[in-house]
């Protein structure tokens, strides 16, 4: 793709096949596989120690995998040294040279590749235009804000027109408001350039906002690879459901009801109609289902008050907590069985709000819950 600023980038497919890595006998990445098509953005999402940064470093060539392959444009680059992979990298702390100006920092990878002066000047100007830093050429990193430093690092990573861009916690050093602004800005630039991108973050909102695909990792294992919508609405495991967004997690057993409908019964006796999910695997000839011991219900799907009266699943409950969080109201309620749930609604300017100790009805539809494996 030819960007408005003049750089010509052709995003290439990126594939990891069975990547594994251990340090001192401890396995930190275990058989991780994924494919990113040209021009797409994949986020490796997970907590600290999940293996996401090690996976990124193997793609960059900074770590050698113990097993597996890395392919760019279907070409195996596993044995190729980092400086010959033609991959752009944005580091968490930006790694700008403090003694070089903005223009000199951006020009550095071009100088290492022995580009001519005129070409360097043209490409540096184009890259700085793309990240909206025209007029900052002669400033030094210490004279820039955190967001501006991040833009310089991004310009440096794309100035040599790599087909693949890697970003390690690129927004982690920014404050919340600036981070939210830069999420949109980085995504805009990535789409404008059409550059294939893999980004690492522990921030679930960042992953949901920026990604075409999310790879959720924990303990070196890839739990789910799917679109942001699929990961949020259809989490494949309990870990994914807990890590992304807020969830009500109920423990119990799942049995067959009428037709394809299922009944989940909590350990405390609450019976819930559900449509099943990733953990609903029927045993041949049995009335019970194997593997599904947890039910997930997002708080925004739990209705409260009159709105719950017509729900297929509806229960008498008592409000234990009522929290006002600006645009939202959050309620912790307990059903007559003792099962506790969170409900989340938009905060009305006027109208019904519930208080601690009030008796209410809560409810949701079968399709609003999901069974997952532990």
Residue map of PLM features:
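Conserved ABC transporter NBD signature motif
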Residues: 68-76
